[in-house]
Swiss-Prot record:
This is Adenosine 5'-phosphosulfate reductase. NCBIfam families: APS_reductase, cysH, PRK02090.1. [4Fe-4S] cluster binds at residues 121-122, 204, 207. It is an enzyme of class 1 (oxidoreductase). Binds 1 [4Fe-4S] cluster per subunit. It comes from Geobacillus kaustophilus (strain HTA426).
Length: 235
């Protein structure tokens, strides 16, 4: 088994990127053979997440899908999760919540921490919960695409994740925005209606706005904060 500690010595698998799913199904088939129940998919239920869930369901219908439920998501996001649960009843969708409720966070750090220190808020409500999830597994799946942002352009199918001391599997690295939507329409998949309202990237409601730059899908995230990532994908 390819693990974090054995990364340097282990032989890394290679996958074709010129087939119908640009390698995604091949990567997922390998990942679930390699790790079985020791791999989880941390899903935001954005549009890439919907594609990955559908692909995963074809490989492992009872896979574990973890949603980092910060308590600050849009109602439309929770509606999307409900639709996904209905479409894929065999999937094990886990709503992972932070240790602190919003009221406890307010008492300890002050009101609306996301405005004053968004990095701290993301750490408390996303990074630490994901670290807790990954403590019990060897690898995790992410919907990162190289096209999404400059910080993601060098992502590989299989990555050594130093932040979480884990293996990070990214099946969609070669998919374009058009590829994602073509797949969703072709498969008639449910998706977050906010995507139709100018939100290509969707996170917590207080820190997400419609995209301001048509060439930057994440330009609506943490607008004016000098921040482009929640911290899950930064070493």
């Amino acid at each position: 088994m390819l693990t974090y500690d054995q990364w340097e010595k282990a032989e890394k698998p290679s996958f074709p990127s010129d087939n119908e799913t640009k390698g995604a199904l091949d990567v997922l088939a390998w990942a679930y053979r390699e790790y079985g129940d020791e791999i989880v998919y941390a899903c935001s239920f954005g549009i890439e997440g919907i594609v990955l869930i559908d692909l995963i369901s074809q490989v492992k219908p009872d896979a574990e899908i973890v949603f980092l439920d910060t308590g600050l998501h849009f109602p439309e996001t929770y509606d999307t999760i409900a639709k996904v649960k209905e479409k894929y009843p065999s999937l094990r969708i886990v709503m992972k919540q932070p240790r602190l409720t919003l009221e406890e966070q307010k008492a300890q750090f002050g009101d609306e921490l996301w405005k004053r220190d968004p990095n701290k808020c993301c750490e408390l409500r996303k990074v630490i919960p994901l670290r807790e999830v990954l403590t019990g597994v060897t690898a995790w799946i992410s919907g990162l695409r190289r096209e999404q942002s400059p910080t993601r352009r060098h992502v590989e199918y299989i990555n050594k994740d130093d932040k979480f001391r884990s293996i990070k599997v990214c099946p969609l690295i070669h998919w374009t925005w058009k590829d994602v939507w073509n797949y969703v329409y072709k498969r008639h998949l449910p998706y977050n209606v906010l995507h139709d309202r100018g939100y290509p990237s969707i996170g917590c409601a207080p820190c997400t706005a419609p995209a301001t730059d048509p060439n930057d899908l994440r330009s609506g995230r943490w607008a004016g904060q000098g921040k482009t990532e929640c911290g899950l994908h930064l070493a």
